Amino acid sequence: ETSKICAPSVSLIDQPVKIVASRLGDRFRVAGTAELAGINTDIRQDRIKPLLKWVEKYFPNVSTETYTPWAGLRPMTPNMMPITRESKMKGVFYHAGHGHLGWTLSAQTAQIVANKISQ
């Protein structure tokens, strides 16, 4: 119960170390790793440890004794530039590859794709 009270109630971004934190229901979610791994959701412990240490440093009253690792697959390109073009199949367009910047870039790249469709 102490952990719930001591965890922040707003989303946080620690830009220098590339860690984000937010509430997810009654849980405290901390994320900060991404790698080009193909279709692979294996979670390496060496990627989890820095996240736990970050929580322990900035939120010492939040317990890290139990945690639930999770990995999601996000289409992304090596240079983080999304793919916004027509496929080989006429009338089918790509709008993917945004990686962790999906919500940030999606509206603008949707406009780019819409412009291509209307041409």
Residue ranges with predicted function:
Residues 3, 81-119:
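C-terminal lid/capping helical subdomain adjacent to the catalytic/cofactor pocket in oxidative enzymes
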Residues 1-90:
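Active-site substrate-recognition segment that forms the wall
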